[in-house]
């Protein structure tokens, strides 16, 4: 559930980023480790920077969170659409990938590719499931919010 929902239906979300340390020793001397909380969730995310930029590889970084948000939104949008269409989804795994561009201009995530492998109970044909995957992509609010193109390349299999 959102942090709050206005009477007009607008959802509001909040997050708090906290860091402590010192940048007094220069660029190479400060910790990138920080924490994100987002009420009402109780769990905090322990984050860092990309290891190539001095971060801790054992922690997630912001770029991974952007990718994870796109993947999670696609998953949840698809499951909702499949359930409404009475399609029995029995498995879903997305091996998603983002690429960072360092061309001219500021660095940015240049592309996100979602590769969901979806298992469904026998019944619907592959084309129907693929149409629902693409409909879910059109309805995914995270993908719709990003300036970066998000591509979905589904694979559909049937459970026994």
Indicate residue ranges for each PLM-predicted region.
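Extended beta-strand/beta-hairpin segments
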Residues: 1-68, 76-160
């Amino acid at each position: 559930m959102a942090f709050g929902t206005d009477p007009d239906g607008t959802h509001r979300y909040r997050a708090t980023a906290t860091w402590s340390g010192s940048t007094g020793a220069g660029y190479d001397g400060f910790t990138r480790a920080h924490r994100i909380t987002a009420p009402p969730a109780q769990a905090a995310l322990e984050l860092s920077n990309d290891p190539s930029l001095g971060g801790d590889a054992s922690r997630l970084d912001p770029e991974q969170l952007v990718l994870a948000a796109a993947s999670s939104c696609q998953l949840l949008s698809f499951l909702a659409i499949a359930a409404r269409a009475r399609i029995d989804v029995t498995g879903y795994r997305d091996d998603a990938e983002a690429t960072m561009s360092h061309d001219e201009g500021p660095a940015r995530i240049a592309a996100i590719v979602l590769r969901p492998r979806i298992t469904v109970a026998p019944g619907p044909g592959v084309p129907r499931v693929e149409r629902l995957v693409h409909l879910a992509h059109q309805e995914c609010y995270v993908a719709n919010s990003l300036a970066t193109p998000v591509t979905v390349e589904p694979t559909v299999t049937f459970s026994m």
